[in-house]
């Protein structure tokens, strides 16, 4: 029984891979190191037609990664993600964020920057959620504008001290 289910799973994964490869922009998403067929197929299955979203913030809201602040009166509470969205999409993006931090140099640098910056350093989990939200913006730009993945643009978010930016 286990063998038959395992072979059926392999057959379904081959079918999914064939279908994903037929989608025109899916190949561009697969160019990112650390993003695989399961990621792209899961993302496209959960999101559907990307053209129905006007901006990446709507996609973040769909995934439940929109930021909400818990405040009342003069009390300023902690800012967290809303979690009001598709749980599977959020889980998928979190898993991909972990994969990207371990396998992709640009995302690793970004994670390192988020966790070690002097002003407002993030905890590791917060950093992974920020990277998941960043990945949504990258996917959105690649799918809607048709641009290629640019590693230099990824690291442009990192604010370096003026000392490093001056010419020698």
Predicted features, each with a name:
Residues 1-168:
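A detector of single, family-specific signature residues
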């Amino acid at each position: 029984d286990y063998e038959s289910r395992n072979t059926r799973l392999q057959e379904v994964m081959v079918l999914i891979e064939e279908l994903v490869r037929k989608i025109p922009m899916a190949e561009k998403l697969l160019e990112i190191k650390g993003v695989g067929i399961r990621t792209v197929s899961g993302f496209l299955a959960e999101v559907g037609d990307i053209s129905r979203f006007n901006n990446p913030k709507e996609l973040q809201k769909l995934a439940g990664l929109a930021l909400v602040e818990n405040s009342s009166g003069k009390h300023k509470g902690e800012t967290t993600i809303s979690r009001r969205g598709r749980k599977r999409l959020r889980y998928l993006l979190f898993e991909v964020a972990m994969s990207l931090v371990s396998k992709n140099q640009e995302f690793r640098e970004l994670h390192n920057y988020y966790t070690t910056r002097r002003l407002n350093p993030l905890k590791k989990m917060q950093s992974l959620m920020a990277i998941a939200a960043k990945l949504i913006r990258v996917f959105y730009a690649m799918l809607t504008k048709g641009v290629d993945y640019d590693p230099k643009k990824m690291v442009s978010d990192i604010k370096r001290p003026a000392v490093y930016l001056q010419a020698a």
